[in-house]
Amino acid sequence: MKILWIGRTQYAEAWRLMKSLHCAVAQGLTGDIALVTEHEPVVTVGKHGRLNNVIKWDVPVYLVERGGDATYHGPGQAVVYPIVALRWPLKRYIDAIEDAVIKTLGTYGILAGKKQGHRGVWVGDRKIASIGIAVENNVAYHGVAINVTIDPREFARINPCGLPASTMISMKELGVVAEVRDVGIETAKKLALELGLTPELISKPPEVPQVAEELKPVRVAINA
């Protein structure tokens, strides 16, 4: 699985690249790839989510294809978007993502795990990583966001995945110093290994046709 760090991005920009690569993987034009990024402030709401879980409309809000509810992305958060042709049951794939995050956090001395009845990765009763996946044409995309240095108070804009914002925690809050890029790339590497794939760092995206589709933010009136 190729792994590409694309730096800090606007969400719609990263989404379009992800969609283009998804189409290319589905058509056999390129192989499995994981994009690693850090977003400018944004809220996304999954296909089963509710807009009333968005509390504060001061950043762009997008409705997207992934599962899950509302989540916030921003600086200080490592986001990994694996674009992978599925040859495993979906549950096995999502478990592999969680396991990759748990093992990555373990290298920093953080004891993380899973929580019965909830997806994502947890430290006790606090959530440190959120997962949302979409599958089309048997190719999975979207992925996982790991809170590295992000201030958990940023999540007060939403009820994250229907949970109170106070549920969220970061590596920094746990006293761990880490770089967003390093955490994201290590997670992608560990995911490749969990899936029996060979991780390969690349410096630029494969040349594939770009989708014409553009993601537009939700437009609502904001009360003063």
UniProtKB/Swiss-Prot annotation:
GO terms for biological process: protein modification process. Pathway: Protein modification; protein lipoylation via endogenous pathway; protein N(6)-(lipoyl)lysine from octanoyl-[acyl-carrier-protein]: step 1/2. The record marks 127 as: Lowers pKa of active site Cys. GO terms for molecular function: lipoyl(octanoyl) transferase activity. It is an enzyme of class 2 (transferase). The keyword Transferase applies. GO terms for cellular component: cytoplasm. Pfam families: LplA-B_cat. It is found in: Cytoplasm. InterPro entries: aa-tRNA-synth_II/BPL/LPL (IPR045864), BPL_LPL_catalytic (IPR004143), Octanoyltransferase (IPR000544), Octanoyltransferase_CS (IPR020605). The active site is at 161 (acyl-thioester intermediate). Keywords: Acyltransferase, Cytoplasm, Transferase. Substrate binds at residues 66-73, 130-132, 143-145. SUPFAM superfamilies: Class II aaRS and biotin synthetases. In the reaction, the free carboxyl group of octanoic acid is attached via an amide linkage to the epsilon-amino group of a specific lysine residue of lipoyl domains of lipoate-dependent enzymes. Belongs to the LipB family. HAMAP family: LipB (MF_00013). This is Probable octanoyltransferase. It comes from Pyrobaculum aerophilum (strain ATCC 51768 / DSM 7523 / JCM 9630 / CIP 104966 / NBRC 100827 / IM2). The gene is lipB.
